[in-house]
């Protein structure tokens, strides 16, 4: 066999093989490659969208956290103000009540002092009358009178 005829036969066989591959093998390979490219592009797009959604969600979460912190701080401040107001109200009520009790006690003490004075005056008057009666009943004697007045003074 001659090299030229072998070469031509091989070229014809190769051309038939290439046409067969282009007709039956190449379209499914190109379709698979295109599908794979499309899936990769969709995956990249989905990843970009998910990344953007994640950034948006993180920003929203941060805003919500900031808002919640602000609300919590406001609630705590309001609670502290209410607690302080309650303490101040209780203090003022306690002071008013203490002053009222002190005034009542002072009035009671004053009343008892007045009663004691009146009782003492009555006793002094009785003793003075008794002393005068004793002096008048006995004979008039300066030493005896002085001694009775000393006893009377001791009783007072």
UniProtKB/Swiss-Prot annotation:
GO MF entry, a single one: proton-transporting ATP synthase activity, rotational mechanism
Domain of life: Bacteria
Keywords: ATP synthesis, Cell inner membrane, Cell membrane, CF(0), Hydrogen ion transport, Ion transport, Membrane, Transmembrane, Transmembrane helix, Transport
Record's keyword annotation contains Zinc: no
Major place of residence: membrane
Pfam families in alphabetical order: ATP-synt_B (PF00430)
Transmembrane segments: 11-31
Quaternary structure and interacting proteins, as annotated: F-type ATPases have 2 components, F(1) - the catalytic core - and F(0) - the membrane proton channel. F(1) has five subunits: alpha(3), beta(3), gamma(1), delta(1), epsilon(1). F(0) has three main subunits: a(1), b(2) and c(10-14). The alpha and beta chains form an alternating ring which encloses part of the gamma chain. F(1) is attached to F(0) by a central stalk formed by the gamma and epsilon chains, while a peripheral stalk is formed by the delta and b chains.
Record family assignment: Belongs to the ATPase B chain family.
PANTHER family noted in UniProt: ATP SYNTHASE SUBUNIT B, ATP SYNTHASE SUBUNIT B', CHLOROPLASTIC
Chain's role: F(1)F(0) ATP synthase produces ATP from ADP in the presence of a proton or sodium gradient. F-type ATPases consist of two structural domains, F(1) containing the extramembraneous catalytic core and F(0) containing the membrane proton channel, linked together by a central stalk and a peripheral stalk. During catalysis, ATP synthesis in the catalytic domain of F(1) is coupled via a rotary mechanism of the central stalk subunits to proton translocation.
Record's protein name: ATP synthase subunit b
Source species of the chain: Psychrobacter cryohalolentis (strain ATCC BAA-1226 / DSM 17306 / VKM B-2378 / K5)
Gene: atpF
């Amino acid at each position: 066999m001659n090299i030229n005829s072998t070469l031509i036969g091989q070229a014809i066989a190769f051309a038939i093989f290439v046409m067969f591959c282009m007709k039956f093998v190449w379209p499914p390979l190109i379709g698979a490659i295109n599908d794979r490219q499309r899936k990769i592009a969709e995956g990249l797009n989905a990843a970009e969208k998910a990344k953007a959604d994640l950034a948006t969600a993180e920003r929203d979460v941060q805003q919500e956290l900031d808002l919640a912190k602000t609300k919590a701080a406001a609630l705590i401040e309001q609670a502290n103000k209410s607690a302080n107001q309650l303490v101040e109200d209780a203090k003022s009520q306690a002071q008013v009540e203490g002053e009222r009790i002190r005034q009542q006690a002072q009035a009671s003490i004053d009343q008892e002092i007045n009663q004691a004075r009146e009782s003492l005056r009555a006793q002094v008057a009785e003793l003075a009358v008794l002393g005068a009666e004793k002096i008048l009943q006995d004979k008039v004697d300066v030493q005896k009178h002085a001694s009775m007045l000393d006893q009377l003074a001791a009783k007072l």
